[in-house]
Amino acid sequence: GVLADRVIDSKCCDLPFEEASGLQLDWKALPVGLDPSMGCLYPDRSSRKREQVVGMVAAVLSAIPNTTESRPPTVVDFGAGSGHLGLLVGYMRPDVKVVLVERRSGTCGLARDRVQTLGWEDRVEVICGCIQEYDGPCDVGIGLHACGALTDMIIDFCTTRNCSFVVCPCCYGQIAGAEGAGVGQLPHV
């Protein structure tokens, strides 16, 4: 089907994401706030977070179309949190417009602070709201640890708009009271 034709074939391997993707970053050389391990108390977790973000960024970079004269490509990070993924994409591709969509107001505030600290207000927009509320341009929709039905929503949003997507679902750990719920009882798009 249409969706199957658009899914990038990938193979599992035992390499860390950074090594498997070929994208190597000097974390110390990045602007303050782009390292997802900053503020993390657990070294193992911060290392895994870096690997996950780099693996996703490599996939996103390969999906972004070339810049045209009419407008820059737009990457929309759904469930963006404080912007770890979207902001790193913006750093790697400064010609791209990045939109961070996050429903939690406190986390939106953190994302806005990070955008302001980086001085990227002109090319990164933070929208505090749900995916259904976003009606702007989108060339690539992305989501890392897209909780609950958000993975389905991102795929639906992108296939409806005929844009690319790179999504990594989560373990459904944040669906309150979902223990023993059947598929028909979970939120669905």
Where are these regions (language model features)?
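Class I S-adenosyl-L-methionine
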Residues: 1-189
